[in-house]
UniProtKB/Swiss-Prot annotation:
GO terms for molecular function: structural constituent of ribosome. PANTHER family: 50S RIBOSOMAL PROTEIN L33, CHLOROPLASTIC, LARGE RIBOSOMAL SUBUNIT PROTEIN BL33C. This is Large ribosomal subunit protein bL33B. It holds the Pfam family Ribosomal_L33. The keyword ATP-binding does not apply. Belongs to the bacterial ribosomal protein bL33 family. HAMAP family: Ribosomal_bL33. The keyword Ligase does not apply. Keywords: Ribonucleoprotein, Ribosomal protein. The lineage of its organism: Bacteria, Bacillati, Bacillota, Bacilli, Bacillales. It comes from Bacillus cereus (strain ATCC 14579 / DSM 31 / CCUG 7414 / JCM 2152 / NBRC 15305 / NCIMB 9373 / NCTC 2599 / NRRL B-3711). The gene is rpmG2.
């Protein structure tokens, strides 16, 4: 079962990306390094509800 998730920057809090994940394979929250346009650099983004 794939669900939509939102990825938020851990430093500024902006929700910059929307993605999908498989809850069966990844039950925990996802953390990815992505580009933050506000800070103009790559930061850690965490899954939010």
């Amino acid at each position: 079962m794939r669900v939509n998730i939102t990825l938020a920057c851990t430093e500024c809090g902006d929700r910059n990306y929307i993605s999908k994940k498989n809850k069966r394979n990844n039950p925990e929250r996802i953390e990815l390094k992505k580009y933050c346009p506000r800070l103009k650099r790559v930061t850690l983004h965490r899954e939010t509800k």
